[in-house]
């Protein structure tokens, strides 16, 4: 199991970040590895929403199927990964007294044997950590004037 965590302070209040974050279709605008996002059903927000995200990292391409299992505005959203890569993930927003927000992204991912299994998860975690730090930089830029 790969455990990943990246975090960044964003110069915006949690509610403003949540408003952007809750529009799931926009995640492809700031997530470099997300090539496309498709809703699996009519629901677009909240716990129970299901999505399929085509994820591309270098030559690798997988469809990441996720169900939102927690939706707690403006503090937390969490997913269960049920596609080729399984596990769980969450976004946490912690607003500071100065109005900025610490955004933390945590994941626990299990890779199938044909994607390298546990050794692949270790390598994948290192690569994803770098990619996700870049994602959080792009997300933070959405809130600069």
Positions of PLM-derived features:
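Glycine-rich portal/gate segments that line the openings of hydrophobic small-molecule binding cavities
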Residues: 26-28, 38-88, 98-102, 134-145
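Amphipathic alpha-helical segments that line or abut small-molecule/effector binding pockets
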Residues: 15-18, 133, 137
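Beta-strand/loop substructures that line and gate deep hydrophobic ligand-binding cavities in soluble
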Residues: 80-133
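Residue-level detector of alpha-helix boundaries and kinks
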Residues: 2, 12, 53, 78, ...
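Hydrophobic ligand-binding cavity/cleft-lining segments
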Residues: 1-41, 46
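Solvent-exposed residues in well-ordered beta-strands and their adjoining turns
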Residues: 9-13, 54-58, 69, 94-96, ...
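Well-ordered beta-strand positions in beta-sheet-rich domains
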Residues: 5-9, 63-65, 88-90, 106
């Amino acid at each position: 199991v790969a455990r990943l965590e990246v975090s960044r302070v964003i110069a915006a209040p949690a509610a403003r970040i949540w408003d952007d974050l809750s529009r799931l279709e926009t995640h492809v605008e700031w997530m470099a590895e997300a090539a496309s996002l498709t809703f699996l059903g009519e629901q677009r927000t909240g716990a129970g929403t299901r999505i399929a995200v085509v994820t591309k990292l270098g030559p690798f391409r997988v469809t990441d199927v996720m169900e939102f299992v927690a939706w707690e505005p403006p503090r937390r959203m969490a997913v269960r990964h049920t596609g080729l890569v399984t596990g769980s993930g969450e976004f946490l927003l912690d607003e500071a007294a100065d109005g900025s927000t610490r955004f933390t992204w945590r994941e626990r991912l299990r890779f199938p044997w044909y994607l390298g299994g546990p050794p692949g998860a270790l390598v994948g975690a290192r690569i994803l950590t770098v990619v996700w730090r870049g994602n959080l930089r792009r997300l933070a830029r959405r809130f600069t004037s």
